[in-house]
């Protein structure tokens, strides 16, 4: 990419040099007598060609350091010319800078007092030589490859502005996430330290130990560790995103020199180093907590060993029991064991004093190893930080060197281009004309193609917009219909509730009858254009619409009275009877006990062999089960005086059932309308 950018800058510098040479040309001199024909013209042409070739070699050697290295290795005297014109080679400068940075890194690392073995340095991969690039001679007769135009300052400014906005947002987000991760890490460290402190207090004070606090502290520490792990992952992801934006900006030639890139990279390095340092602190806290865990394990082991010894001496005594007295033998055995234990502990103490120095040296060795691990981690973190900082300094130095190189190259190309500016002007003018012709033709074709594509897209967008408008219109209609269906469904349920309960404020049967005119008119207002609804509303009985129907419970209560009176007059025919006949029927009803029976839905009724008692019993069962429809069918089979008494009840019950059936049809119609209008 740098080579392509350098070639572009070379071509643009040549153009500017020719323009300046044309503007600053001397005034026309008086005509000179044409020289005589001689061999001087050929010599001048040869000298001009030599100068042009030498200038091309010098320019390409500046652009491609590998080509310069090959030329210097092939022709050693050329090295002095290149050093005088172009300065010292960039490869040598880079090697020298790498050596200086290596010395700086080595000096920056703090040296320990102990003499450590030297680190083995991995050998650098050998630099593979590139294949020599073939330079084709310029031929005016051939088509010149169109040059990629340099982006305008507005485009460069817009891209840099966009990059800066992205970098600011990414830096702010990364800093926020790293701040959250740091706070979570600090909470984890506090939780680990708290767990270690509670564990030490619990182990030291075994009598009043509360291990639930230790468990809860450990759970808090683990929970905080999970939280800070997630926060750390988020923070590093945001840092990687910031570095990705920086790398993308460096790859783009228009934004590669933006000074904010280096600052953003430095910020990313600092944030990453901050996470590494806080991780080192967390590891240190966990290591200190591990020492307390080992101490707790040793205490538990000694207590278990003592419990086993006590159990072997006093197998029948629960040493963990409270408020239990020991007998004399158990106390003697316990005292003897205590004396033996004291003697044993004295011997162990003397041995322990001998081994104490070994244990201390071992503990010091373990602590030294732990300190070395921590120091190694800190050293690796610091080395990575120093390495990233040095890389950043190298990039900053490269940016500064690149700007100085570009200035030197521009001055050298101006001096080199002054000798053959006229010839190159003619060539470039011709190539530019050809390029403009081709470019204008391509632009016209692209504009025409884009215009056709735009027309197609506009047509498709208009068609899509019309479809969306139609869909929205139909959806509005469906919404209105669905809303009306829901209102109709609610009104239908209110109608059923009115049929079932009537006027709840009524004190007697007649006052609880509520006319249905108001509810039916409300249904007509909700669906004024529905013929099915109007037909069902017109089918309601007039008595139900004007006076109202009895409620279901009132009809059941009336049937209870009808059942009692019907059994008393079951033996009376339609023409009535004497007082003795009524008395006999009453006495007969007293001696005939209605045994509860279960009648099935498929049981047939023999009309000729069924009396009024069985009919009333069947009707009572159906009424109690809430099946008024079958109750009416059975009650219609009554004969004599009970049939006359049941006539009004049958009419009122039939009116109630008809109204309820019509209301249920309206509810079903409302449910279907609601489902149909749901999209």
Swiss-Prot record:
For the Mitochondrial matrix compartment, the record's topological domain ranges are 18-42
Null allele outcome, as annotated, is: Egg-laying defects, defective oogenesis in 30% of mutants, reduced brood size and increased resistance to oxidative stress inducer paraquat. Abnormal mitochondrial morphology with mitochondria appearing larger and as localized swellings and tubular extensions. Mitochondria also have elongated and curved cristae that are stacked with a reduced number of junctions.
Which Pfam families did the record assign? Mitofilin
Protein's UniProt keywords contain Membrane: yes
Tissue localization of expression is: Expressed in the gonads and muscle cells.
Keyword annotations of the record = Cytoplasm, Membrane, Mitochondrion, Mitochondrion inner membrane, Transit peptide, Transmembrane, Transmembrane helix
**PANTHER family hit by this protein:** MICOS COMPLEX SUBUNIT MIC60, MITOFILIN
Subunit composition? Component of the mitochondrial contact site and cristae organizing system (MICOS) complex.
The entry's protein name is MICOS complex subunit MIC60-1
**Which species is this record about?**
Caenorhabditis elegans
Write the gene name. immt-1
């Amino acid at each position: 990419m740098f080579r392509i950018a350098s070639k572009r800058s070379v071509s643009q510098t040549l153009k500017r040099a020719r323009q300046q040479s044309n503007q600053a040309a001397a005034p026309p001199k008086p005509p000179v007598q044409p020289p005589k024909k001689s061999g001087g013209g050929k010599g001048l042409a040869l000298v001009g060609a030599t100068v042009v070739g030498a200038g091309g070699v010098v320019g390409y050697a500046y652009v491609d350091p590998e080509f310069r290295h090959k030329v210097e290795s092939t022709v050693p005297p050329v090295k002095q010319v290149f050093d005088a014109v172009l300065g010292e080679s960039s490869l040598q400068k880079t090697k020298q800078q790498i050596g200086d940075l290596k010395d700086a890194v080595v000096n920056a690392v703090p040296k320990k007092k102990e003499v450590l073995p030297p680190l083995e340095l991995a050998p650098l991969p050998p630099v593979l030589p590139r294949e020599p690039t073939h330079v084709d001679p310029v031929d005016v007769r051939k088509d010149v490859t169109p040059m990629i135009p340099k982006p305008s300052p507005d485009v460069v400014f817009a891209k840099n502005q966009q990059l800066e906005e992205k970098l600011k947002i990414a830096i702010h987000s990364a800093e926020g996430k790293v701040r959250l991760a740091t706070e979570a890490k600090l909470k984890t460290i506090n939780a680990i330290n708290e767990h270690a402190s509670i564990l030490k207090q619990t182990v030291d004070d075994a009598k009043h130990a509360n291990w639930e606090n230790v468990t809860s502290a450990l759970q808090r520490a683990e929970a905080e560790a999970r939280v800070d792990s997630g926060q750390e992952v988020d923070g590093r992801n945001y840092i990687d995103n910031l570095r990705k934006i920086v790398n993308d900006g460096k790859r783009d030639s228009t934004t590669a020199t933006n000074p904010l890139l280096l600052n953003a990279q430095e910020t990313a390095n600092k944030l990453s180093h901050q996470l590494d340092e806080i991780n080192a602190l967390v590891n240190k806290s966990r290591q200190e907590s591990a020492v307390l865990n080992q101490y707790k394990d040793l205490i538990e082991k000694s207590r278990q060993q003592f419990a086993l010894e006590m159990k072997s001496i006093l197998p029948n005594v629960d040493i963990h029991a409270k408020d239990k007295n020991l007998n004399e033998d158990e106390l003697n055995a316990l005292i003897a064991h205590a004396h033996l234990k004291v003697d044993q502990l004295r011997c162990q103490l003397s041995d322990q004093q001998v081994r104490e120095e070994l244990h201390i040296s071992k503990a010091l060795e373990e602590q030294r190893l732990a300190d070395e691990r921590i120091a190694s981690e800190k050293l690796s973190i610091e080395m990575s930080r120093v390495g990233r900082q040095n890389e950043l300094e190298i990039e900053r130095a490269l940016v500064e060197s690149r700007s100085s190189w570009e200035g030197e190259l521009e001055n050298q190309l101006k001096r080199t281009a002054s000798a053959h500016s006229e010839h190159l002007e003619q060539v470039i003018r011709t190539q530019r004309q050809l390029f403009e012709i081709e470019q204008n033709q391509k632009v016209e074709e692209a504009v025409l193609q884009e215009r056709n594509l735009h027309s197609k897209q506009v047509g498709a967008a208009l068609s899509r917009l019309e479809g969306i408008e139609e869909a929205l219109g139909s959806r509005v209609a469906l919404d209105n219909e669905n809303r009306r269906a829901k209102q109709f469904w609610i009104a239908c349920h209110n109608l059923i509730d009115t049929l079932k309960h009537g006027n709840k404020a009524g004190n007697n049967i007649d006052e609880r009858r509520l006319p249905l005119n108001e509810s039916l008119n409300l249904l007509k207002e909700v669906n004024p254009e529905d013929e099915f609804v109007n037909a069902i509303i017109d089918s309601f009985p007039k008595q139900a619409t004007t006076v109202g129907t009895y409620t279901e419970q009132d009809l059941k209560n009336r049937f209870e009275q009808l059942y009692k009176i019907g059994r008393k007059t079951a033996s009376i025919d339609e023409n009535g009877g004497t007082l003795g006949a009524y008395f006999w029927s009453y006495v007969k009803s007293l001696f005939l006990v209605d045994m509860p029976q279960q009648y099935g839905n498929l049981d047939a009724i023999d009309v000729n062999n069924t009396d009024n008692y069985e009919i009333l019993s069947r009707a009572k069962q159906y009424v109690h089960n809430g099946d008024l429809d079958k109750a009416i069918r059975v009650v219609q089979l009554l004969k004599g005086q009970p049939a006359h008494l049941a006539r009004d009840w049958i009419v009122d019950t039939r009116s109630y059932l008809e109204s309820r059936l019509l209301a249920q049809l309206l509810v079903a119609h409302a449910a279907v309308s609601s489902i149909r209008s749901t999209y």
